[in-house]
UniProtKB/Swiss-Prot annotation:
HAMAP family (alphabetical): HspQ
Domain of life: Bacteria
Principal location class: cytoplasm
Biological process per Gene Ontology, one example term: response to heat
Disulfide bonds: none
Keywords: Cytoplasm, Stress response
Pfam families: YccV-like
Protein name per its UniProtKB record: Heat shock protein HspQ
Free-text function comment from the UniProt entry: Involved in the degradation of certain denaturated proteins, including DnaA, during heat shock stress.
Organism: Pectobacterium carotovorum subsp. carotovorum (strain PC1)
Name of encoding gene: hspQ
Localisation: Cytoplasm
InterPro entries documented for this protein: Hemimethylated_DNA-bd_dom (IPR011722), Hemimethylated_DNA-bd_sf (IPR036623), HspQ (IPR022866)
SUPFAM superfamilies found in the cross-reference section: YccV-like (SSF141255)
Keyword Nucleotide-binding part of the UniProt annotation: no
Length: 102
């Protein structure tokens, strides 16, 4: 059984880049057909660990869809007023998460 550190709708932060984001889906292991260099560079995490689909905001506040290993993420500790668009996205996903699982 795979145990995930983060849940769908949870706000997180990229450990290296510092970008905030929201988990929108979870794969129990790496599931993309062919990894791109950006997805695997600097990442020693085995492909058998959890991987997360995350919508992040770059340093200009623009949304970016990313696919990241659990080891690249940390829990978001900032105030909910720092990233209002991510707060709204997290709330919508959390409300719909029970529907998405069935």
């Amino acid at each position: 059984m795979i145990i995930c550190k983060f849940g769908i709708g949870q706000q997180i932060r990229h450990k290296l880049l510092g970008f905030p984001g929201v988990v929108i889906d979870i794969d129990p292991e790496y599931s993309l057909e062919t990894p791109t260099w950006e997805e695997i560079s600097g990442n020693d995490t085995p492909r058998s660990e959890p991987w997360y689909h995350v919508v992040m905001e770059d340093d200009e506040g623009q949304p970016i869809h990313t696919y990241l290993a659990e080891a690249q993420l940390m829990k978001e500790e900032l105030s909910e007023h720092e990233h209002p668009s991510l707060n709204e996205l997290a709330e919508v996903i959390q409300r719909r998460a029970p529907q998405l699982r069935h």
